[in-house]
């Protein structure tokens, strides 16, 4: 593909999943922006349930939204034209250019979806080229670029690199161990024409003094003929991992934590970036709780979003965690549900089309919810996809913004209006029901609710008041300002430890 007028594309590949491609791509975007360029993030195909909704109402992976912010651009679904959202049983929802186009099984995906996917990727590239005629594409690969059984129908790695004649950076995670085998093994599986695209190696998550790796750097450069352009130090995780399996290992204890919030780690957990602003609160300790483990006595519980709401609800009930949560709420505990989490708090959930992992023998029947909010939810094929701005009336007045992303339509049970208050000026956005013993159960469809600084602090102060703690200041900015600071911090470290000139050909 011709990229006339645009600078030569760059591509970040990894020796494995979790090597750090997403954050290195974000850092590269921000560094190029600092140098006066217009970087354009792009990942042809991503598999993730951590999604974002752009201004047009299109779904895309959160990691590409983050890279867009790093590039100083508004996220748009063309930056991630193919999104696969796993939903269990080796199936995924297929999103093309922001819209759902069907469901695919793993064993037949490439047979059925390769050609449509490649067509959509090329269309998205043309759109971006028209929008940013003098920009530079910053491409992110997926997993390893040398999965031999998948290379023939690769949509994300070397096919795209060759198509765009991109200069590639290969990232390896030394924290996992075996970094030399990772790099040499990856390069040995590349064809000569593919290996020529690799212009630099990057060692990620190195602990200790950089000079301790000098011998390793020299050996790699002599063995491969490719420069090691950087050794990135190990950093405390700044942003959520792409894979929810990494969540339990992410964080340690906070010395200054004053309240503990338990977050249910659902089997089909989605949009866990919703919790980032709480993770960034120095006085808040998040504790992830899996089905089958003990809930304990946290100061509050959050049920996050789910890609398979009914299946996850069934998991909570079978494991006993659902009944623990009911007891906790009825004893005065604070419970907050986001999207699918709010739906689980309701009375019933009906999934006549089998969209959310129905586990009953009769798909037309409904499943009992946790019955902590008087809501009935029906899942429909049409999906609510939109950004929105509202004014809340609970816990107090606050301007909030975020996005909706859900199949379910929730309605209050007739006659329950006196016991439940709408959370915002849009009554369908969420509800709150006060417990008899001071705690409150509430839920919302608004993803990103905790990014709103004033609202987040108002909610935390409800919990703090019940513990006899002083209120936190509520006159604080939106989390996007803190995200900017984190991106700048990441890029400062990247700029100090990585020389991108060989990648740029200078």
Swiss-Prot record:
NCBIfam families: cobQ, PRK00784.1. The active site is at residues 339, 447. Pathway: Cofactor biosynthesis; adenosylcobalamin biosynthesis. Keywords: Cobalamin biosynthesis, Glutamine amidotransferase. GO terms for molecular function: ABC-type vitamin B12 transporter activity; catalytic activity. PROSITE patterns: GATASE_COBBQ (PS51274). This is Cobyric acid synthase. The gene is cobQ. SUPFAM superfamilies: Class I glutamine amidotransferase-like (SSF52317), P-loop containing nucleoside triphosphate hydrolases (SSF52540). InterPro entries: Class_I_gatase-like, CobQ/CobB/MinD/ParA_Nub-bd_dom, CobQ_GATase1, CobQ_synth, GATase_3, P-loop_NTPase. PANTHER family: COBYRIC ACID SYNTHASE (PTHR21343:SF1), DETHIOBIOTIN SYNTHETASE (PTHR21343). It comes from Prochlorococcus marinus (strain MIT 9303). It holds the Pfam family GATase_3. Belongs to the CobB/CobQ family. CobQ subfamily. Residues 258-455 form the GATase cobBQ-type domain. Catalyzes amidations at positions B, D, E, and G on adenosylcobyrinic A,C-diamide. NH(2) groups are provided by glutamine, and one molecule of ATP is hydrogenolyzed for each amidation. GO terms for biological process: cobalamin biosynthetic process.
